[in-house]
Amino acid sequence: MFLDCSSLIAENPPRPSNGIAVTDIDGDGAFELVVAGYCTANLVLKWVDGRLVDIAGPLLADPAGPALGLAAADIDGDGREELYVVNCDRATGTKDMADRLFACFGKHWLDLFAQAENAGAANHTAAGAVAAMDRWGHGRYGFLVATDGGPLRLYELTRRGRLEDGAEEAGLDSIGAARGVTALSIVSDHMDVVTVNDGGPNELFRNLGDGNFEEIAEERGIADSRPSGRAVVALDADGDGLFDLVVGTWDGAQRYFQQRMGGGFVESAGADFSMPGRIFTVVAADFDNDGYEELFFHAHGEPNRLFGWRNDQWQELELGDAAEPKGLGTGAVAADIDGDGRLELILAHGSSHGGHGSHGGGHGAEGNAQPLSVFRPEATNNGWLRVQPLTPFGAPARGAVVSLTAGGRRQRRAVCAGSGYLCQGEPVAHFGLGPLHAVEQVEVRWPDGTVVTVDNPPADRLLTVPYPPE
């Protein structure tokens, strides 16, 4: 499936890297790859003249920071995404270094947590993953931080422009050893939350529509307290219009929770799929543009794995160069870095510190330093369409759900708010069309329930869908 093209990265020395997020850092409308470095510089990799070049300034690079997870979203309604970076120098409990929340004013970046009025709100509990969350559907996001040994945190901007933790008010302040977190409309018409925990049950928080949540994992059948959960990703694998959940675990069985009509989930992974492994993160994406998303399991110290949905079940596929049997896998994302309509696979490597141990990064990280990897799928003539919904403020509408109908078949994607473990994919719904090069309809549903349909959009391009005017 994959061919190594890591030479596209202009400078790529061995380094301890963790999460990867995809966002527009410099405001030019194109996306960059932001790579978290553990006590080494964070990278902002931009596609320039056929190469990925680091454009991070000193503030974003933050070389002293033990960066793990990161996510982007527009928290202040200015039309540009802010960037949340989780720093963590402890496996659990209280940590020394605060997280960063970078905001851009003009061309000048600031860390909002470093401002006097926000210093008291900063997170000092060990944490790893972070996801964007628009709990009301207003187009202004908060950042949901998955902590270890403390409550989940939900950082939102108040009307006075201060950062406050709204998790307790929202009913999201559960305490556990949270690892992967994702947010999308999975059991309600608004953004719900799924977290996987290390050694404890998974959690599913249903959005009640008024900014409050209720935890329903056990009654819906996904609590599953046995494995040490790491990563979680949502996709509609079977095409029934309901999002299913895949959970990657560290030395436990991998899980495929299939959602049924009525809202319950059934664990239905086959023997090959569920095989235990040291899985750090999971990516769901249609790499070959055949109209069905593949699942990439990024492993630590053992070969990666790839599955495709074939004949109503998951079947293992050949990875090609991306197997990386000696790779110390950490973060991973899929993104179309060169605009050709095919998704590249970008992999980070570093220390897992025993998987847990800590969340990633880890001390003595120099011995676990490896370069980043970039892989391209083998070329096909399959059609594609990429859909980018925007908020009322013109920023990416993370958490929006996009449905596409082509050849009478309907596919669904959620625009990534946070996924896998420590990562956040591009804010675009990517659809392969197989042999087709025509689309009957695209439907976008925003987190507030607003729906727009676009009939017969041209294929093989990026379709931007603004929020409709009132």
Language model: regions and residue ranges:
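Beta-propeller blade repeat segments, especially FG-GAP/WD-type strand-to-loop junctions
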Residues: 1-3, 41-55, 93-113, 150-166, ...
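Acidic/hydrophobic-patterned starts of short beta strands in beta-sheet-rich repeat architectures
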Residues: 27-36, 77-87, 137-146, 188-196, ...
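A generic tandem-repeat structural signature
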Residues: 63-126, 130-133, 143-144
